[in-house]
């Protein structure tokens, strides 16, 4: 059954055609030049079966939504179809609620809903949200017997002297050219982790270095094994490069000298005294051999400089870019990580389109079931993912370059296109697979448009097939008579 909407009276036909009833959705037209453009829904969808969240099972709305463009002059007369250029007219469609007040174009995809993690979950699930480093496992050992709480930043006053931290690999390494104040031994939980920044040391790896020999290295110091050129190329330090360039290059070196005009590491002086460990600060001060303030008593031998360069290429740049965490910095992180581990992560929602199918339609000059020409817009392949009651909002626009929408436009413009008209369909219901009552009968307008080459979904029952055949015979007879005249 063909249903017509927007039954206008002559007193309000020239006005912007807004609904007088506040409960109905907003429908209007637009004046452009001396012509008024409006949309009429000549066929409303009645029901559909929900298509779900897949892309293969399509359940189109039945019957298909069809809109018609109406153009009027100042005297309320309708412009003939042959006097209009419909090449650049199109209608867009989107999904709205049953009252036409809220859009429902997006729906939450069911696969994106994260499950709630209970606070008392297994140990394995709690470890995923916390740090897997060694200081966390030793955190209970730092608790005092009386309070039983981990020290925080507020417990360390700014003026309080903090014990300096030992430098990594400090055991077994003797500073040859300078004296570093001996740091008191502190707990392992307050210092560096037992592993090196680059993983376990291997003898055959270009990133590893052989362990230092036992005993006093100042008495018998062999020639150091220099790192690979790839390792030195990655090192940000260039403190001893000037001395190496002045010495004759040994034959065992597979590479030559490199340029050290521009430093590749930030100056250690940019860090404040409270951020840099004393051992690191003293270590960095000893590397500036270009500084004229150095005394001759602090100069080192070539062997100590080579060993110092091999040592600092593997450890110093890591401590310069990432200062050693102090006790006050690690304790709050340990407490917060244990507390955050019980809180579930925020859900990651993924939304998808509720209305599936082509959301725009081009204008087509067709004949309706009464053999009257018109400019129609067909939406024959629209599906809805979820069940409920909805409406379709349709908007008319013209995308042609001037003089569009008048006759003579030859191309599409690149500017913003104004909306010329807006209208809504009547309410339709989307059912689940079990509650779907069935596809409605094919309408006469669908048969008439299908006979003109438009692909519309038609019912497969015997009555609809008979109507299609009868309409086809009438269509052919009328076309033959029209051509003879």
UniProtKB/Swiss-Prot annotation:
<feature type="compositionally biased region" description="Polar residues">
    <location>
        <begin position="326"/>
        <end position="341"/>
    </location>
</feature>
<dbReference type="GO" id="GO:0005634">
    <property type="term" value="C:nucleus"/>
</dbReference>
<dbReference type="InterPro" id="IPR021740">
    <property type="entry name" value="Velvet"/>
</dbReference>
<keyword id="KW-0805">Transcription regulation</keyword>
<keyword id="KW-0539">Nucleus</keyword>
<comment type="subunit">
    <text>Component of the heterotrimeric velvet complex composed of laeA, veA and velB; VeA acting as a bridging protein between laeA and velB. Forms a heterodimeric complex with vosA; the formation of the velB-vosA complex is light-dependent.</text>
</comment>
<dbReference type="GO" id="GO:0005737">
    <property type="term" value="C:cytoplasm"/>
</dbReference>
<dbReference type="InterPro" id="IPR038491">
    <property type="entry name" value="Velvet_dom_sf"/>
</dbReference>
<dbReference type="GO" id="GO:0030435">
    <property type="term" value="P:sporulation resulting in formation of a cellular spore"/>
</dbReference>
<keyword id="KW-0804">Transcription</keyword>
<feature type="domain" description="Velvet">
    <location>
        <begin position="33"/>
        <end position="459"/>
    </location>
</feature>
<dbReference type="InterPro" id="IPR037525">
    <property type="entry name" value="Velvet_dom"/>
</dbReference>
<keyword id="KW-0749">Sporulation</keyword>
<dbReference type="Pfam" id="PF11754">
    <property type="entry name" value="Velvet"/>
</dbReference>
<protein>
    <recommendedName>
        <fullName>Velvet complex subunit B</fullName>
    </recommendedName>
</protein>
<feature type="compositionally biased region" description="Polar residues">
    <location>
        <begin position="234"/>
        <end position="243"/>
    </location>
</feature>
<feature type="compositionally biased region" description="Polar residues">
    <location>
        <begin position="134"/>
        <end position="155"/>
    </location>
</feature>
<comment type="similarity">
    <text>Belongs to the velvet family. VelB subfamily.</text>
</comment>
<feature type="compositionally biased region" description="Polar residues">
    <location>
        <begin position="267"/>
        <end position="304"/>
    </location>
</feature>
<keyword id="KW-0963">Cytoplasm</keyword>
<comment type="function">
    <text>Component of the velvet transcription factor complex that controls sexual/asexual developmental ratio in response to light, promoting sexual development in the darkness while stimulating asexual sporulation under illumination. The velvet complex acts as a global regulator for secondary metabolite gene expression. Component of the velB-VosA heterodimeric complex that plays a dual role in activating genes associated with spore maturation and repressing certain development-associated genes.</text>
</comment>
<feature type="region of interest" description="Disordered">
    <location>
        <begin position="107"/>
        <end position="353"/>
    </location>
</feature>
